[in-house]
Amino acid sequence: MTNIVVSYILNPLIYMVPVLLAVAFLTLIERKVLGYMQLRKGPNIVGPYGLLQPIADGVKLFIKEPIRPSTSSPSLFVLPVLALTLALTLWAPMPMPFPVADLNLSILFVLALSSLAVYSILGSGWASNSKYALVGALRAVAQTISYEVSLGLILLSVIIFSGGFTLQTFSTTQEATWLALPAWPLAAMWYISTLEETNRAPFDLTEGESELVSGFNVEYAGGPFALFFLAEYANILLMNTLSAVLFLGSSYSTTMPEFTSLTLMTKAALLSMVFLWVRASYPRFRYDQLMHLVWKNFLPLTLALVIWHLSLSTACAGLPPHA
């Protein structure tokens, strides 16, 4: 009985609570960073240096009454819960250094669940019965499906490097050097694709304020809106943690496993800061530019690199490092 409680209740809670706390403070960091980049202060009233601002925002949103438009679909309108559930489930196979769910095909698990997140966006846009929400949802589906093709091919290339589908093997592969150095074109395309996958600027066409009011979540208020918000930021942290594992090596130490967690989270935090920097620096892409980037640039490049990495091992009679 104790094992069941630890495995199925305590372990998931132990990783969910820090993720939700990190999400809360990522929103604060984003507002502060954007503030200083625009030569203003950002939140600095609630608590010392504005540190209690995310708590105040959370309390304010969750005590508001969740309003549902009379013309909306009541069953599909609860999809923000699915968005957050998927965002938190994705953290299960992350090697920090020991995963909550030790899966043999953890990369495929992450790819499959990140694809499912589109359904929560599409369903909420459809359920709102608003043309702005529907257009935002359709944009999200089109761009996510487009970029997942290149994401899958980039993952295939790094799997060829490491010789395994488990995320722990990447620590072994990168003991000598980070994969971001020999495979820097892959790392650059992966990072840009994760920006798009999380609907961040300059690819935030799903919630283009100047065109679609607020995008797919325009009819949501209070708690359900906060759940979408939490899911978006949990996905940002997850994608950056995954980028750190795949390309920046999580430097596993058998004597000090907590050192692995510390270095991994530091790398993920730095990559998240670059997300904020990009948001402050670049204007939004036009929709046709977004599609041209993936279908005319990323797809041919990633296909060429997959063929190149496959042919290299055959030509040099080499095998993945630990095979």
Curated annotation (Swiss-Prot):
Glycoprotein is among the record's keywords:
no
Asked if Ion transport is a keyword of the record, the answer is: no
What's its membrane topology?
Multi-pass membrane protein
GO annotation, cellular component aspect:
mitochondrial inner membrane
Q: Which reaction does it catalyse?
A: a ubiquinone + NADH + 5 H(+)(in) = a ubiquinol + NAD(+) + 4 H(+)(out)
Q: Which residues form a coiled coil?
A: none
For this chain's UniProt record, which GO biological process terms are given? aerobic respiration
Can you tell me which family this protein belongs to? Belongs to the complex I subunit 1 family.
**Free-text function comment from the UniProt entry:** Core subunit of the mitochondrial membrane respiratory chain NADH dehydrogenase (Complex I) that is believed to belong to the minimal assembly required for catalysis. Complex I functions in the transfer of electrons from NADH to the respiratory chain. The immediate electron acceptor for the enzyme is believed to be ubiquinone.
Stored PANTHER family: NADH DEHYDROGENASE SUBUNIT 1 (PTHR11432), NADH-UBIQUINONE OXIDOREDUCTASE CHAIN 1 (PTHR11432:SF3)
Q: What is this protein called?
A: NADH-ubiquinone oxidoreductase chain 1
Originating gene: MT-ND1
